């Protein structure tokens, strides 16, 4: 597993900087295109809401890319966050391979 100290680009940063800014659209316009509330888009853009499969499908359709693009972006961030959380890593360190656990 490759560990990096640098956090991957967040979903919100990607939506805002790589899509909304170049397309010159605001959160309200994106919300309308997606068929969701402006609050939902705001929460995505500010990192308060994670990408779900449904959201990935909507963003892919709106921006002309794939759902996997959005899901992979979310997954990379989730994994980075877990690997850089001492509390979560301490819990993972207690996990034993199944052969050891049953011996």
Residues of each region from the PLM?
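A short, Lys/Arg-rich alpha-helix, primarily the initiator
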Residues: 1-25
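Short, charged recognition helix plus adjacent turn
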Residues: 71-103
């Amino acid at each position: 597993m490759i560990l990096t100290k640098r956090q991957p680009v967040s979903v919100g940063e990607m939506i805002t900087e790589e899509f909304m800014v170049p397309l010159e659209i605001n959160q309200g316009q994106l919300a309308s295109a997606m068929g969701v509330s402006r609050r939902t888009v705001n929460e995505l853009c500010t990192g308060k809401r994670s990408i779900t499969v449904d959201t990935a499908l909507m963003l892919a359709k709106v921006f002309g890319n794939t759902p996997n693009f959005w899901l992979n972006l979310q997954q990379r961030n989730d994994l980075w966050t877990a690997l850089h959380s001492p509390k979560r890593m301490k819990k993972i360190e207690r996990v034993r391979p199944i052969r050891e656990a049953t011996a």
